[in-house]
């Protein structure tokens, strides 16, 4: 089944230029984000540009640094990007989803959202661990800044409801109440 979904995903990506749709229906990795970045660049450099790009997202999360590379590219796009969430949007996938154009971040009613604190394992010499702690702090600050920009929530509220010690699962309606999306509706 996974192999079939990957083949379907690749077929749609080959045709996305004509339809201005991109499916991110997998783990967030450098490779998957590279494909999305290329799609955004290709569409932005076309003479006859689309008015709106559509990124459909179902993701269990993954590499947060790769996600932020895509987020920065989305922010730099001259073409607004609508994000459409289906099924589950978790962790790094959520960072990408909320970067969509305000007013154009749509969740379907059955979408589950997962937000949690940044996690990372580390080992090494003392100086290496101190460097890791600094990177951990910088990444947490980037996450909070991104949440603030995309939701309008205060840092205190973000830490309470989106980045508490435990994983935070939200329904699509709860996500809308927190400003993570702009609409909850079926795809027509």
Descriptions of predicted regions:
Residues 1-188:
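Terminal-region recognition feature
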